[in-house]
């Protein structure tokens, strides 16, 4: 494993859904929820 260098949309979306939000943007290693 290690630091993510590219965002995985499916992983980002799942993480956002866990906190009751949806994926806003997914760039580089940053997942933004909204």
Swiss-Prot record:
Any GO molecular function: potassium channel regulator activity
Chain positions of site Penetrates into Kv1.1 and Kv1.3 pores (when K-21 does not penetrate into it): 17
Expression by tissue: Expressed by the venom gland.
Keyword hit for Lipid biosynthesis: no
GO cellular component: extracellular region
Disulfide bonds: 7-26, 12-31, 16-33
Keyword terms, alphabetized: Disulfide bond, Ion channel impairing toxin, Neurotoxin, Potassium channel impairing toxin, Secreted, Toxin, Voltage-gated potassium channel impairing toxin
Main localisation: secreted
Subcellular location: Secreted
Residues of the site described as Penetrates into Kv1.1 and Kv1.3 pores (when K-17 does not penetrate into it): 21
Family to which the UniProt record says this protein belongs: Belongs to the short scorpion toxin superfamily. Potassium channel inhibitor family. Alpha-KTx 18 subfamily.
Protein task: Reversibly blocks Shaker B potassium channels.
Description of its domains: Has the structural arrangement of an alpha-helix connected to a beta-sheet by disulfide bonds (CSalpha/beta).
Official protein name in the record: Potassium channel toxin alpha-KTx 18.2
Originating species: Tityus discrepans
Organism classification: Eukaryota, Metazoa, Ecdysozoa, Arthropoda, Chelicerata
């Amino acid at each position: 494993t290690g630091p993510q260098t590219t965002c995985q949309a499916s992983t980002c979306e799942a993480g956002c859904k866990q906190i009751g939000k949806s994926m806003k943007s997914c760039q580089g290693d940053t997942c933004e929820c909204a």
